[in-house]
Amino acid sequence: MTTTKKELSYFRLKLEAYLGEHFPERVNENTFITARADEALTAYCDAIAQGFSHPKAEVMASEVLYQGLHFSKYNTLVSVLENEFEKELPSPLLERLTPILLKNKAVQSVFDKYELTDDFGASPEYEKLYTELTGTIVLIIEVNGLPTVDSENMTLM
């Protein structure tokens, strides 16, 4: 049996950690991770060869490493759940719900309406997305009968 050994690379490890925290749905995209880590390493080496300092070269490499990864659907869902549903949903459910919602077709159709660029979170469209996601999640909770906490009595409804 042949096994492949994963190459240890600073940029690969850095990207994998970032994806795990902000894009858990992408942590197994090995081709993407390898290519992006290689691009970042090349950018770093090129910057050093051009006379840039090591810290500046790392900044330049990080720009390559995280290109297209500044806006996270996962983080957006976490934000909506924490800000809008913290009192209604028991905490273990909040934590488990994000990856499930990320795969939900209704949630995906909301995200698909928007061009999610790196700077989308600072755009006026972000508020519309946030509001639509909130409404969609309310419907998902109602349709699926998810347990909610009555904020006045703190009991399961």
How should each PLM-predicted stretch be described?
Residues 1-157:
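C-terminal alpha-helical interaction appendages
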